[in-house]
Amino acid sequence: MNKEEVLIITFKSIQDVLELESITKNGRMIPVPSCVKAGCGMCFMSKDLNIEKWRVFLEENNISYEDIVRVDF
């Protein structure tokens, strides 16, 4: 099975994941993969691998997050 690198954004609360999903179409909410630790059990996955761009976007939109990591998925 071919894996591809994706960006995973983790959150402490599901409300933050839902808020991000409601304002961008550049990814989707998924259960947290076993290789990643997260507080709420759900995360946001995107094929856009630009971590700094995501950090700025999250901060500009006042969305709290735990971590942003790249994983093979």
Positions of the model-derived regions?
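Positively charged, small/polar-rich N-terminal and surface patches that mediate targeting and assembly
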Residues: 1-73
